[in-house]
Each structure stands twice: as C-alpha cells, then as structure tokens.
Amino acid sequence: MGDTNYFSGTVKLLGNPIQKVVRQKILTTKIWVELPQYRQNRCVLLVFWGNLGDEVKNFYQINDYIFIEGYTSIKKTNLKLNKIVITGLKVYPILFDLKSTLKNS
C-alpha cells in the first residue's frame, strides 16, 4: 500500500522560481504551478530543496509542463484558507523548449 501523501502528476509552471537560503546553508526553490483538471484547474506551491531546485530554475521556464513526484502538505493561512504545498523529489520533462533553454545557459 502506498503513502497517502505521495503525489505524482503533470503540472504547468506558472511563474519564475524564487530561491531562498534557509539557515545560511540550505537552498530552497519555490514556484507556483497549475494542476490541469477537467473541471477547474488548481494552483499549488511546489517546493524543491538543494540542487534539484537549481536544476529546475536553470532548465525550465514559464508554461513548461513537467512530471513531478513528491509529498503533499496543507498549510493554514490567516484567511481561513488552506494552501496546498508539494515538496518535489523528482522532476521529469514533458513539454519544454530545449533550444531556448540552451540559449539561456
């Protein structure tokens, strides 16, 4: 039986990754993504730790689709809303423009 918080699926990148150093040595990368669904698309926050976040920032752009694996969590906000956060463990490219990615490197 699998873990109930484990997520794998296709997401669309909505913005540029934002990197931040935590505790003066741990790099985190956050990016808003969209989960394509039949009824209504959902936006969630995707978080990467360490070198994986650097790879996401360097290789992927806005509107690229990636397949991710990771764990989901729910963060409570002040507005009585719940924010879904996915901590990404693995990333696989699906639809992205390799030529423009190589030009930016």
What function would you assign to each model-found segment?
Residues 1-105:
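Single-stranded nucleic acid-binding surfaces, predominantly the OB-fold ssDNA-binding core
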